[in-house]
Curated annotation (Swiss-Prot):
The modification N6-acetyllysine is found at K68, K236. Belongs to the class-I aminoacyl-tRNA synthetase family. A motif ('KMSKS' region) lies at residues 639-643. PROSITE patterns: AA_TRNA_LIGASE_I (PS00178). CDD domains: Anticodon_Ia_Leu_BEm, LeuRS_core. The keyword RNA-binding does not apply. This is Probable leucine--tRNA ligase, mitochondrial. One of its GO terms (molecular function) is aminoacyl-tRNA deacylase activity. It is found in: Mitochondrion matrix.
Length: 903
């Protein structure tokens, strides 16, 4: 018996068997079986014919932990294998999963399992986007520290994910609010600062005048009032930190051409960035001939003509007129609403040293999102009119040659260059001097990352009265958050109140200084997390370059379409920056994107706009009405939320239907990019329940056939039965090909399930002789279970346990001593891939099948040749000769041609 135990391997721990009376008689030892698993084969050694809700639950209880343990034993260290990095967007730890989470993580889990079965080295990591405003609100409302609230939520949500049977690479778990993560967020910020890509300027914030604090946009209600105090929110200028994302606009716009798999998202990214045709240039400002130390950045679409500048224009809403600028009074004195106003302020171009006046424009809105632009009459008729109206001096700097070529004149070293060459040379020089020159659009703004919050990554800057803003030395990172005992939601940034933390020494001169009290936008934390997953425990750097280069780019990134613009833009920006810093070799972070749709619930709304709970709705009539008032209700499908009373608790539906059923429902109900209208009464849920039952029944028939005492003998099959088996072989290969394509190319997992349902339907029609004697049936049944396993891992694991111990198998290419999830993904048989020399072409006349004729393969896709071939065939002569044929139609998908004729 020792050799039998060795051969059983994996299943030896599950089952014991005795062989008595020959190889085809199986008896199972008596033993005490836990009550919760009395009905399943893996526990009892007896296959039950019925697949009930209790069976499903017993199967999942038995296999849940075992599947998890299998996954944890798979090594991710074998770099000789091709890799596959599947990443689903990590969640904010709100404390409870919703069905949207279940959908995205079911998709990523399914793809990860599939890729492992293909022999890929796979990571499917999970972590927590753990900083953010809700934790701080909880601190104010419930007197809970943000850290304890967050960690408690993470603990609960991790258990929820585990109960869903999701096998993440938990050893790679990251949490953005932990110092070992945000240390490296701070490190990257300092690298940006050193590269001139992080800077401060004044910007508008939402200000609560009662609580004396800054509000996030989501803390301002639809009436413009504070969520907490109810005060009318004011707009106030504060000095804020920005990341100069415009510096990478052109590179990121151009790189979209290298992302063919970003279906539907590339256009959104391109629109967000805009047409990158110009650049910003920096100016120093003077008033009445005196330098002020202040700077102004302005945009031009024609930087090559910068020597023809007549003025710099600002909008009436510009920060210089409303913030804390020393120029505000001089500018306001010059302002006449509704008129273009010349001011006493002069702007000195930091590249050309030209000095031109600042003009306040009459119009409030400039092009794109601009609030300042450079006036160049040589390239703008509007600028010409304004300069002439205000009597401003300027030079014509563009001359047109007889052949139409435009060249520069009166433009210092750029004189004589074509406009195109001058554009490149001048912007390059500006970038080299760090006075602008980054090619960008007139609509893209730099990224404001300052938040006047506690629960965020501290900005690692010290403000020194002597040295100015000074980055914290890298060896002193992380700058950790101080422990603040209570939160009131009043009085500005909580960090500003932590005097012991704020007051420090300047890293440069060692004099008295103060820490920056703003924290970073949480989008900064999530802009580089995909890198950290590749090397999550590295204490010396954000990630090891060689390790990141192996895993990157992410092969498939899955998340909601609502993140298709801002988050992806910021993530791409950080990846481009890290590439330029020689930290990684790949510029783009994500190869393929899958933007999954929402799961929507049904809502019932009164004419007043109030949403009702389902218990308040009378559904007995032809239209839903309010149970009390009998008012007619507006019925819609909307994103699930508590306020709309249309949410579904994932734990409740899993308890009711089982994990595999919910997984299959989510995957089958709609293509992943489409919305799902959650309604368990639709065809989708009954369909996947029936399909699981069919898989179980197919297995039962096969086990019974092989346990009948008869040995399988393929030579006993009749010609008709051999033809039946051949069709199963063809069907199996066709399904393998199509399902593999769905898993690797379009991710239409609903279509993959449909294909597998079709194969199970074909197998259920098989005759008893084919089931017993045909290797084709056995192979197709096993391939079906292997292909279904990534989507329904529990039920297929149980089925495979039953199949594994069926005696006298005819297929030797499966590894029977390991579970179904460790099988190799089925491959299409080479014979199936060989195109036949002759195709059997189905001929239809007026949509009625009339027979088939053999057509040479090289002719079968040519409409005209097939048409003539059919007419000259015996069938064509007999059925079509002398009849009026309008036109024939050759199917692009199948070997079929239809002849509409007039009798």
């Amino acid at each position: 018996m020792a050799s039998v135990w060795q051969r059983l391997g994996f299943y030896a721990s599950l089952l014991k068997r005795q062989l008595n009376g020959g190889p085809d008689v199986i008896k199972w030892e008596r033993r005490v079986i836990p009550g919760c698993t009395r009905s399943i084969y893996s526990a009892t050694g007896k296959w039950t014919k019925e697949y009930t809700l209790q069976t499903r639950k017993d199967v999942e209880k038995w296999w849940h932990q075992r599947i998890k343990e299998q996954a944890s034993k798979i090594s991710e260290a074998d770099k000789s294998k091709p890799k596959f990095y599947v990443l689903s967007m990590f969640p904010y730890p709100s404390g409870k999963l919703h069905m949207g989470h279940v959908r995205v993580y079911t998709i990523s889990d399914t793809i990860a399992r599939f890729q492992k079965m293909r022999g890929m080295q796979v990571i499917n990591p999970m972590g927590w986007d753990a900083f953010g405003l809700p934790a701080e609100n909880a601190a104010v409302e419930r007197n809970l520290h943000p850290e304890s609230w967050t960690q408690s939520n993470i603990k609960h949500m991790r258990k929820q994910l585990d109960r869903l049977g999701l096998c993440f690479s938990w050893d790679r778990e990251i949490t953005t609010c932990l110092p070992d993560y945000y240390k490296w967020t701070q490190y990257l910020f300092i690298k940006l600062y050193e590269a001139g890509l992080a800077y401060q300027k004044e910007a508008l914030v939402n200000w609560d005048p009662v609580d004396q604090t800054v509000l996030a946009n989501e803390q301002v209600d639809e009436h413009g009032c504070s969520w907490r105090s109810g005060a009318k929110v004011e707009q106030k200028y504060l000095r804020q930190w920005f990341i100069k994302t415009t510096a990478y606009a052109k590179a990121m716009q151009d790189a979209l051409a290298d992302l063919p798999e970003w279906y539907g998202i590339k256009g959104m990214q391109a629109h967000w960035i805009g047409d990158c045709v110009g650049c910003h240039l920096d100016f120093t400002l003077k008033v009445h001939g005196q330098a002020t130390g202040e700077k102004l950045t302005a945009y031009t679409a024609t930087p090559e003509a910068i020597y023809g500048t007549s003025h710099v224009a600002i909008s009436p809403s510009h920060r210089l007129l409303h913030g804390h600028s020393s120029l505000k009074e001089a500018l306001r004195m010059a302002l006449v609403p509704g008129k273009d106003c010349l001011t006493p302020v002069m702007a000195v171009n930091m590249l050309t040293q030209q000095e031109v006046p600042v003009v306040i424009l009459a119009k409030a809105d400039l092009e794109g999102s601009l609030d300042s632009k450079i006036g160049i009459p040589s390239t703008s008729s509007e600028d010409t009119i304004l300069a002439q109206t205000l009597g401003l001096a300027y030079s014509e700097v563009i001359e047109t040659l007889p052949d139409g070529t435009e060249r520069l004149s009166s433009s210092a070293e750029f004189t004589g260059m074509t406009r195109q060459d001058a554009f490149l040379a001048l912007t390059q020089k500006a970038r080299g001097k760090r006075v602008g020159g980054d090619v960008t659009s007139d609509k893209l703004k730099d990224w404001l990352i300052s938040r006047q919050r506690y629960w965020g990554t501290p900005i690692p800057i010290v403000h020194c009265p002597v040295c100015g803003p000074t980055p914290v030395p890298l060896e002193d990172l992380p700058v950790t958050l101080p422990n603040i005992a209570s939160f009131t939601g009043k009085g500005g940034s909580p960090l500003a109140m932590a005097s012991e933390w704020v007051n420090c020494s300047c890293p440069r001169c060692k004099g008295a200084a103060k820490r920056e009290t703003d924290t970073m936008d949480t989008f900064v934390d999530s802009a580089w997390y995909y890198f950290r997953y590749t090397d999550p425990h590295n204490p010396h750097s954000p990630f090891n370059t060689a390790v990141a280069d192996y895993w990157m780019p992410v092969d498939l990134y899955i998340g909601g379409k609502e993140h298709a613009v801002m988050h992806l833009f910021y993530a791409r920006f950080f990846s481009h920056f890290c590439h330029d810093q020689k930290m990684v070799k790949h510029r783009e972070p994500f190869h393929k994107l899958l933007a999954q749709g929402l799961i929507k619930g049904q809502t019932f709304r009164l004419p007043s706009g109030q949403y009702l709970q389902r218990e308040e709705v009378d559904l007995t009539g032809s239209v839903p009405v309010h149970a009390k008032t009998k008012e007619k209700l507006e019925v819609t499908w909307e994103k699930m939320s508590k306020s709309k009373h249309n949410g579904v608790d994932p734990e409740e539906v899993v308890e009711q239907y089982g994990i595999d059923t919910i997984r299959l429902y989510i995957l089958f109900a709609a293509p992943p990019e489409k919305d799902i209208l959650w309604d368990v009464k639709t065809d989708a849920l009954p369909g996947v329940l029936r399909w699981q039952q069919r898989l179980w029944t197919l297995t039962t028939r096969f086990i019974e056939a092989r346990a009948s005492g008869k040995s399988p003998q393929p030579q006993l099959l009749s010609n008709k039965e051999k033809a039946e088996a051949r069709k199963l072989w063809e069907y199996k290969n066709s399904v393998i090909s199509q399902v593999t394509t769905h898993f690797t190319e379009d991710f239409s997992l609903n279509s993959a399930i449909s294909q597998l349902m079709g194969l199970s339907g074909a197998l259920s029609q098989a005759s008893q002789s084919v089931i017993l004697h045909s290797p084709e049936f056995e192979d197709a049944l096993c391939a079906l279970m292997v292909m279904a396993a990534p989507m329904a891992p529990h039920v297929t694991s149980e089925i495979w346990a039953g199949l594994a111990l069926v005696p006298r198998k005819l297929c030797a290419h499966y590894t029977w001593d390991v579970s179904v999830l460790l099988q190799a993904w089925p491959a299409v048989d080479p014979e199936f891939l060989q195109e036949p020399e002759v195709v059997q072409m189905a001929v239809l006349i007026n949509n009625k099948a009339c027979g088939k004729i053999p057509v040479p393969q090289q002719v079968a896709r040519d409409q005209d040749k097939v048409h003539e071939f059919v007419l000259q065939s015996e069938l064509g002569v007999r059925l079509l000769q002398g009849r009026s044929i309008k036109k024939s139609f050759l199917s692009p998908r199948t070997a079929l041609i239809n002849f509409p004729v007039q009798d």
